Amino acid sequence: MNPEYDYLFKLLLIGDSGVGKSCLLLRFADDTYTESYISTIGVDFKIRTIELDGKTIKLQIWDTAGQERFRTITSSYYRGAHGIIVVYDVTDQESFNNVKQWLHEIDRYACENVNKLLVGNKSDLTAKRVVSTDAAKEFAESLGIEFLETSAKNAANVEKAFMMMAAQIKKRMANAPVAPKAGVKLTPGQQVPSNGGSKCC
């Protein structure tokens, strides 16, 4: 076990271009915000270590490009992700409509039991809002995933979103059956789980 942390969780931020994924990451990792918008090219990542239930958790957070032309690059980053945060812009109906497509990408590329969180960003732009909180909440509930609205600009719920995701993953890890180690007796007919395939986390 690495003495610096108890857990290392890989998180992924996905969603349409311009919804504020990079801003959310900057706010959480560095507590900074910039109005100037530069599209992420391919992927970028930052690391932040948090404390949760007396455990030290290192979060490796990957920020992916939302543009279609980067899909083939970013799809490989789904593998091995413990948690995926799907971000849309509350002032952009199309970005919310496209959440279904992003969830399809998760089903296609990510681990079967990966944790998911739906985040509606830019909640500070109340006058420009087009996606209601209730509609998004209802949609998330129908899929059985958690939902939060955030504002990277004023830091509303940003910390909460990442902490919620970390707590979900930690809970899943704690409840997951431990693979048999060498010397452990297996019941007749029981197979040792392999580490191969896409069911990786």
Curated annotation (Swiss-Prot):
It comes from the Eukaryota. Rab activation is generally mediated by a guanine exchange factor (GEF), while inactivation through hydrolysis of bound GTP is catalyzed by a GTPase activating protein (GAP). It is a peripheral membrane protein; Lipid-anchor. The keyword Amino-acid biosynthesis does not apply. GTP binds at residues 15-23, 33-40, 63-67, 121-124, 151-153. One of its GO terms (cellular component) is phagophore assembly site membrane. A motif (Effector region) lies at residues 37-45. One of its GO terms (biological process) is protein transport. Gene3D superfamilies: P-loop containing nucleotide triphosphate hydrolases. Keywords: Autophagy, Cytoplasm, Endoplasmic reticulum, Golgi apparatus, GTP-binding, Lipoprotein, Membrane, Nucleotide-binding, Prenylation, Protein transport, Transport. SUPFAM superfamilies: P-loop containing nucleoside triphosphate hydrolases. The small GTPases Rab are key regulators of intracellular membrane trafficking, from the formation of transport vesicles to their fusion with membranes. Rabs cycle between an inactive GDP-bound form and an active GTP-bound form that is able to recruit to membranes different set of downstream effectors directly responsible for vesicle formation, movement, tethering and fusion. YPT1 regulates the trafficking of secretory vesicles from the endoplasmic reticulum (ER) to the Golgi. This is Ras-like GTP-binding protein YPT1. It comes from Phytophthora infestans (Potato late blight agent). The gene is YPT1.
